[in-house]
């Protein structure tokens, strides 16, 4: 008699999960592997809060929350936050840090597609930051995010453009020269052109409202938002009301 096959978990790259599981204990180390995320988080948070008209009192979902850097900061703004991730260890770190910080965040281990099947149209704001390039089917994630947001609600995506410049800066520069992130963090083949992302958005109820680039200056060691989406970029969309 054949042994039962383990259940299939759709749209999960277990090698990607393993990368982040291995370094999860250092998620909140401001000088560790996740230092860039800590550095850019005020920019991400400010962009999301400003374009959402503030986060206080809103129900927010952070898709691919990892160790909870963005999720916790949105909760500090007065939002009711759910953090979603498929990595067990990052979620344990996120839960412990929230407990130690006295911040309430509901962390859940499941895919965004599974969550959408149970919680359609329940969130005022959905964020999906630096996650699309780590899953086998990013378009499926976009569809699920569109299902989860309320009509008139906000959905934010951030990812990396796919071109020679982004490979040089995000892979060669960030991983091998500046060593800002661990080697192997990114695979340029999984990067997503803005036109591709907007095409997926257009196939849902979402409508693009704004796009901005995230830029790093190695001379001043600073990040800023501004025109130009040839490397890192963020997209703000809203769910259309029938």
UniProtKB/Swiss-Prot annotation:
PANTHER family in the record: METHYLTRANSFERASE, UBIQUINONE BIOSYNTHESIS O-METHYLTRANSFERASE, MITOCHONDRIAL
Pathway: Cofactor biosynthesis; ubiquinone biosynthesis
Residue sites binding S-adenosyl-L-methionine per the record: 44, 64, 85, 129
UniProt protein name: Ubiquinone biosynthesis O-methyltransferase
Gene Ontology BP annotations: methylation
Keywords: Methyltransferase, S-adenosyl-L-methionine, Transferase, Ubiquinone biosynthesis
Gene: ubiG
SUPFAM superfamilies, per the entry: S-adenosyl-L-methionine-dependent methyltransferases
EC number: 2.1.1.222, 2.1.1.64
Organism: Citrobacter koseri (strain ATCC BAA-895 / CDC 4225-83 / SGSC4696)
Role of this protein: O-methyltransferase that catalyzes the 2 O-methylation steps in the ubiquinone biosynthetic pathway.
Record field: catalytic activity: a 3-demethylubiquinol + S-adenosyl-L-methionine = a ubiquinol + S-adenosyl-L-homocysteine + H(+); a 3-(all-trans-polyprenyl)benzene-1,2-diol + S-adenosyl-L-methionine = a 2-methoxy-6-(all-trans-polyprenyl)phenol + S-adenosyl-L-homocysteine + H(+)
Top EC class for this record: transferase
Organism domain of life: Bacteria
Assigned protein family: Belongs to the methyltransferase superfamily. UbiG/COQ3 family.
Entry's Gene Ontology molecular function annotations: 2-polyprenyl-6-hydroxyphenol methylase activity; 3-demethylubiquinol 3-O-methyltransferase activity; polyprenyldihydroxybenzoate methyltransferase activity
């Amino acid at each position: 008699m054949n042994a039962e096959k383990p259940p299939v978990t759709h749209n999960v790259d277990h090698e990607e999960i393993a990368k982040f599981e291995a370094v999860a204990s250092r998620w909140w180390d401001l000088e560790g592997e996740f230092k860039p995320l800590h550095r850019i988080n005020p920019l991400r948070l400010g962009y999301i809060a400003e374009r959402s008209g503030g986060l206080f009192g809103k129900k927010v979902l952070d898709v691919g929350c990892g160790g909870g850097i963005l999720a916790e900061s949105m909760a500090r703004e007065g939002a009711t936050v759910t953090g979603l991730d498929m990595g067990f260890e990052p979620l344990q770190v996120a839960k412990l840090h929230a407990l130690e910080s006295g911040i309430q965040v509901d962390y859940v281990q499941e895919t965004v597609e599974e969550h959408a099947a149970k919680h359609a149209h329940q969130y005022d704001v959905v964020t999906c930051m630096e996650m699309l390039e780590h899953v086998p089917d990013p378009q499926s994630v976009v569809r699920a995010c569109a299902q989860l947001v309320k009509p008139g609600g906000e959905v934010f995506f951030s990812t990396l453009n796919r071109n020679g410049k982004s490979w040089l800066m995000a892979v060669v520069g960030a991983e091998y020269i500046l060593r800002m992130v661990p080697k192997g963090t990114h695979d340029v083949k999984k990067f997503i052109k803005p036109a591709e992302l907007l095409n997926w958005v257009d196939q849902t109820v979402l409508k693009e409202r704004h796009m901005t680039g995230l830029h790093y200056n190695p001379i001043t060691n600073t990040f800023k938002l501004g025109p130009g989406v040839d490397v890192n970029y963020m997209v703000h969309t809203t769910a259309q009301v029938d």
